[in-house]
């Protein structure tokens, strides 16, 4: 039934935008609720205790690349650690523990010098990675490259069935992730970081560019440079891509010359064999004549300069 006499199709763009934002927020909240439900189920029947952060080791399979946790630090500083982490008794170090999920919370609480609220539960290696993967998938806070590298690490130690269950993906997408990680030097992805917002197509483009260079190590070295490391992670990715793309001049593609006010005056095409300058007579007819008249004088000036340099 129309709302206030206006059908859905007749609603203004602002109304549609508000509705879309509302739907997105509800979907995000639903995912967070499901992630918390996973945590509750895994911790079901277990008491929350406080542990010394120094007694807890990270998971044996890293899922995250080190990133900014300022927002989480502020939240825990002001409100405390609201959600406990899940740990298991360390399989080889008595008296110590290993994280199943909650690495960022552990890091934040450690930096604040607080005890860690945790649930301790006996878990097999397989249960740890499946719990770790499912919680990450519901929160959707891992970037593409973090997910791909996590899958790659899991694939070294577990069957494809366990990896697929942990990642909640099919065999085809898993294969694509594994091939992509294999194609990228680990030093390069470490230097770039998590790259929020950079999806699989962009990482695939980087892998294809890397395949064409003679020294991938030099690309990683550039990514580790002080200049690039000063940028946010996603900007580091863009900088690396830009450094690998051939310039328009190198590819023989035309460049446009224009005046400060934007008037197009010429198109320049360069290659190893020749340089072509194409002037639009319709846009600047007098300039075309001016250039033709001055080419001989320009060449004479060039020749004289060469003679002078040889005489020095």
Curated annotation (Swiss-Prot):
SMART domains assigned: ParB (SM00470)
Name of the molecule in the record: Putative replication protein B
Keywords: Chromosome partition, DNA replication, DNA-binding, Plasmid
Cellular component annotations (GO), alphabetically ordered: chromosome
GO biological process annotation, one example: DNA replication
Organism field: Rhizobium rhizogenes
Sample GO molecular function, one term: DNA binding
Described function: This protein is coded by a hairy root Ri plasmid, it is probably involved in its replication.
Family: Belongs to the ParB family.
Gene: repB
